[in-house]
Every structure is written in C-alpha cells, then in structure tokens.
A protein has these predicted regions:
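Conserved phosphate-binding/catalytic loop of the ribokinase/pfkB sugar-kinase fold
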Residues: 76-113
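Conserved beta-alpha-beta core of the PfkB/ribokinase-like small-molecule kinase fold
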Residues: 115-183
C-alpha cells in the first residue's frame, strides 16, 4: 500500500494470499532456485485443509499430519517506503498424540525420501521444547543432514541434540540466551557451535552474515540493495544454503548463495518468490573472509 498510518483505514493496492511459515517459505524458495521440495508440518481445521490444497496447487508436494486446532494466520503489510507491520497469531496447540503421528510420518515416509531437510519455526503450543530435539534425532537416525532455524527453548533443545546446521539471527541468539547482548554475529555463530551445532550461521540484518564450525569462521558481506519486502529472506537463505551443500559446494560458496538468495528475495513483493537470475547476479557481490579459529 502507499503508506501505513495508525488509526486509518488501510486499503492495499495488491494482495497475496498464500501458505506461509518458515518451512513453507524455504520450500518455495528451493523450487524457485530449481530444486525439488516436500513440505510437511501439522495442519489443522479449515485453514489447514486450505494450506494443503494451496501447497499442492503450487507444486510444493504437501505431506502433512493433521490436528484438531485451526492453523494460525499471519498478516504482513508493506508500504512504498519499505516499512512493514507484521501481525502473527500465536502458535495453535497440538496434542502429544498429534505430534507423535507427525513424527512417525516424518521418520517412516519423508526423511527416507530426502537428501537434506530444514526444520524451521516453532513447535505447536502445548508441546515441550524437547520435541525440537526429537526431530533432530530423527533426522540423524535417517542419515539426513538437517538445518534448524528456531529460537528460545526449542533452539536450545535442538542444540542439545547436536544438529548439523543451525541458522538464526544474531538478535535471536541473544534472546535465546546463547550469547550476551553485545555479541557480534561472529560471537553468535561461535556460541552456537559451542552449544552443539556442527555448523552455525548467524545473520545480522543487512550488516553481515557470519558462520563457524569447530575450526573456522567465515564472514560474508551482504550486497547493498533497496529492499521491497524482507519477509522470507531468511528462509530463502536456508533454501539456497541447503541446495548448495547438497550439490557439493564448500561452505563459503554455499554461504554466498544463501546471502544472494536472501537479498534477491528482499527485492520481491511476495515471500520466497525470488528470481534465480537475480540471485545468481547478486552472488558476485558477496565477499567472504575466512579465519582459522
């Protein structure tokens, strides 16, 4: 819309209604970048049925488990200046039995069909944070490298299970208690490795992306762009990073592709609907610095 103003009726010029969530956005970006993606999660009620139908129509191969509670809705409003308002309903509940059914679906049917996996977002309300760790352990048993994008107690539970990759924002690392408030992106990445991640990536908005493993730190620049809508940029990063590693790229190359994909997404109006040619061009503007720990 032209301008976001409080206490006024807001009439958008364009609207996009589509299934969302961090995992779905990552799948959408993976397909945009030429990959194939299966989507899964716990869907509920009329909204959940619509999510599955819309994902199928979009070619995002839905294989979902179902719960009684209605799936939540999120609203994102962006104006011409790039300012945005995000209204996210709280996570809807699922029962332990409903999560157990989802985990069986994941272990028995989906992970065996995957080369890599991404688990992103929050566990449904009413479930213990340890269920994030259960997903990490399921992926390890299946031999599938897993990227975790989570915060708070769920992130800490995933770290205890020793995930292959963790990717979060620097501020999220601070809020989750991984590092102190004055920590840099490098500090956050190193802190995540010390907590259990084999490879950790910490983003810091448009400033910097840092990554670390047990022996090396990488610092990546972010291309200067005029962003239209940053929603889905982190998810696009996750998709590009995972695809690059699946194709055998080394870590700095995979990180550069992730940074470029996230930047390309920010140039679009709809989440995770990036142009792969724009992403490829932006990759040339990403520089990296490698530091031995």
């Amino acid at each position: 819309m032209a301008r976001i103003e409080l206490d006024e009726v807001l009439r958008p010029r364009e609207m996009f209604v589509l299934p969302g969530g961090k995992g779905v956005n990552a799948a959408r970006a993976a397909v945009a970048l030429g990959g194939r993606a299966i989507t899964t999660g716990i869907a509920g009620g009329h909204a959940g049925r619509w999510i599955v139908e819309a994902l199928s129509a979009e070619g995002l191969e839905p294989h979902w488990s179902f719960a009684r509670a209605e799936s939540r809705t999120a609203y994102v409003t962006v104006d011409e200046s790039g300012s945005s308002v995000l209204v996210y309903e709280r996570a809807t509940p699922a029962t332990p039995d409903e999560f157990a059914a989802f985990l069986r679906l994941l272990e028995e049917r989906l992970l065996p069909a995957c080369a890599r996996a991404v688990v992103a977002g929050s566990i449904p309300a009413g479930l213990p944070p340890s269920d994030h760790g259960a997903i990490v352990e399921a992926a390890r048993r299946a031999g599938v490298p897993l990227l975790v994008d989570a915060t708070g107690p769920g992130l800490l539970a995933a770290l205890e299970a020793g995930p292959d990759i963790v990717k979060i924002g620097r501020i999220e690392a601070v809020e989750s208690g991984v590092v102190s408030e004055d920590a840099t992106a490098v500090d956050a990445a190193v802190g995540l490795v010390e907590r259990g991640a084999r490879l950790a990536v910490a983003t810091d908005g448009a400033q910097e992306v840092a990554a670390a493993d047990a022996s090396t730190v990488w610092r990546m620049s972010v291309p200067p762009i005029e962003a239209l809508n940053p929603v889905g940029s982190g998810d696009s990063f996750n998709a590009a990073l995972s695809l690059a590693l699946m194709d055998g790229a080394d870590v700095p190359t995979a990180l550069a592709r992730g940074v470029a994909a996230g930047s390309a997404n920010a140039l679009t109006k709809s989440a995770a609907s990036l142009d792969p040619e724009v992403a490829a061009a932006l990759e040339d503007d990403v520089t990296d610095t490698t530091i031995e720990r």
